[in-house]
Amino acid sequence: MRLRSLNEAEVITLFTPFVPHPPSTTLAKDMDPFEPLGRALPRRVRHVPYRLDHGMTEMHADFLPTSGAVVIVVCVTTNVLQYNSQAFEQQVKFARAIARRTSGNASVTDVPVILLLADNDASGQGYANAMQDFPALVTINDYTTAALTNAVRVLFGN
């Protein structure tokens, strides 16, 4: 897997949604709920949040040419869906727009794009099935620090 063989100079671009903290969080309220994910990644990380209601912007696309890998988080846990019933559709739209930009840009066509799907309800398999067009899909059952750290272990084999 190319992701595991990134050189030290390559940057991982981490796109994360603006969502509320998980209910069981121990993080400070002024900390992004995905900051532990960025810290756990074993390379330099460019953490770029995205707003569900705005989707991909040119600012997001501008980060792609310098990426050695792209990780896109889609979070559809119960607390997120209670906050925004369109959260899944909005995040999928963002993720697909990023994937199209990478596949359509000659300078980043070999850059791995990984989708990290956080869900915690019975609809989880349906969400995963809807994302099967992504070449790499990792699912986790919440977005606590422990779950995010375990996802990094799966991705990087650490």
How would you name each of these model-derived features?
Residues 1-158:
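C-terminal non-catalytic regions of proteins with extracellular/luminal or membrane-system context
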